[in-house]
Regions:
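C-terminal motif of bacterial Sec signal peptides marking the signal peptidase cleavage site
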Residues: 13-16
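Edge beta-strand at a domain terminus
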Residues: 19, 90-96, 134-159
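Extracellular beta-rich ligand/substrate-recognition surface
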Residues: 54-57, 115
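Contiguous, well-ordered beta-strand patches that form the walls/edges
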Residues: 40-42, 62-130
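Sec-dependent N-terminal signal peptides
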Residues: 6-9
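Flexible, solvent-exposed loop segments that connect beta-strands
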Residues: 41-55
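Positively charged n-region of N-terminal signal peptides that target proteins for export
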Residues: 1-4
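N-terminal helix-cap/turn-to-beta initiation motif at the start of protein domains
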Residues: 18-35
């Protein structure tokens, strides 16, 4: 009887700690190669924005992204010849916020080629939309003490 109770507790814990099905489905959809086509703001004006403590919006637009969900890694390449080009590596996590609305947080942490972070700093974005051919991230930052939203629109290149 005691062994049966222990087995039941282990089974319940295993199922309770598993990744939600919707997050698993998101990982399948995000897998592959994407292009960051457009970056916009929820306010009008001219802004000097540096994304992921790396480079400007102008340099980031047109970049190529690869997501490898089975080990939560990826990379992006800056393609604009007027910018510091090259491949950047990252690790990522998709966290479900609300199953009813389908909202997710997307956590991205820049790393070196070996998957190690020099600063251990990461970025939390809202995965506002994810479909078979398009994806949108939203990042809310503070500008003059008020919320300022950055929208990043991706299109899928290939799986």
């Amino acid at each position: 009887m005691k062994k049966l109770l222990i087995l039941a507790v282990i089974a319940a814990t295993t199922f309770a700690c598993g990744t939600p099905k919707t997050v698993q489905e998101s990982r399948k959809v995000i897998k592959g190669y994407w292009s960051l086509d457009n970056i916009s703001y929820d306010s009008s004006g001219t802004f000097n924005v540096t994304l992921f403590n790396d480079t400007s919006v102008e340099c980031m637009e047109g970049s190529s992204w690869r997501f490898i969900p089975n080990n939560n890694t990826g990379n992006y390449t800056i393609n604009n010849s007027n910018c510091p080009t090259g491949e950047r590596n990252f690790i990522f996590t998709i966290q479900e916020i609300d199953p009813a609305s389908g909202l997710y947080d997307f956590l991205l942490k820049p790393t070196n080629a070996k998957g190690k972070s020099e600063t251990n700093a990461g970025y939390r974005l809202r995965l506002a939309q994810l479909g078979e051919s398009s994806m949108r991230w939203e990042q809310t930052v503070s500008l003059d003490g008020k919320p300022f939203k950055i929208n990043m629109n991706f299109s899928k290149i290939q799986e």
